[in-house]
């Protein structure tokens, strides 16, 4: 809870800072808004990627699943993928596949969290960028995201693949 408050304070300070920058033309105003979104997304990426595995209801379960996938063969991954998407049996076959592919590059769960956070918040930042016109709109969107506790969604949403 304190972290979310800190994120909101940093987002508010960032909104104040980027709003105070010269924006004599729409292009400059747009650049300031874009830089503010990047600033906030970096904060949200760090919030998500640096959390402890005990934070959130599902993070530890996802950690255990990540460790389990290390011991799972590629054949089992593909059989599970086929049974879910071809035969319609089971669920969430994409998530183990993404984990297994990621583990070709790194077996560190923290790096995986960072990877997921970058993908999620880059997409969220792009969405906010396309749907807002002013820095104040961006702040409201980020505040709603934080206040409604959607900050957990960056990892649990990926598990729905």
Question: Predicted regions: what is each one?
Answer:
Residues 1-44:
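Start-transfer (signal-anchor) and selected internal transmembrane alpha helices
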Residues 17-18, 49, 101, 127-131:
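Hydrophobic membrane-targeting alpha-helices
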Residues 28-39, 104-115, 137:
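Membrane-interface starts of transmembrane alpha-helices
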Residues 34-35, 39-41, 48-76:
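Extracytoplasmic loop-helix module adjacent to an early transmembrane segment
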Residues 46, 50-53, 111-119, 155, ...:
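Hydrophobic alpha-helical transmembrane segments of multi-pass membrane proteins
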Residues 115-132:
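Transmembrane-helix motifs of polytopic, lipid-linked glycan transferases
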Residues 137-161:
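Membrane-embedded helix bundles of polyisoprenyl
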């Amino acid at each position: 809870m304190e972290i979310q408050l800190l994120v909101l304070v940093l987002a508010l300070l960032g909104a104040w800072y980027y709003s105070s920058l010269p924006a004599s033309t729409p292009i400059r105003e747009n650049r300031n808004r874009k830089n503010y979104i990047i600033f906030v997304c970096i904060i949200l990426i760090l919030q998500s990627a640096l959390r402890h595995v005990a934070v959130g209801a599902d993070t530890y379960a996802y950690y255990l699943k990540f460790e389990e996938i290390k011991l799972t063969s590629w054949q089992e991954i593909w059989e599970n993928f086929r049974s879910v998407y071809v035969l319609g049996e089971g669920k969430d076959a994409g998530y183990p596949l993404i984990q297994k592919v990621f583990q070709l590059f790194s077996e560190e769960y923290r790096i995986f969290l960072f990877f997921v956070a970058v993908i999620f918040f880059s997409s969220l930042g792009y969405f906010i960028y396309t749907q807002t016109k002013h820095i104040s709109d961006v702040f409201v969107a980020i505040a709603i995201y934080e206040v409604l506790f959607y900050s957990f969604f960056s990892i649990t949403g990926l598990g729905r693949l």
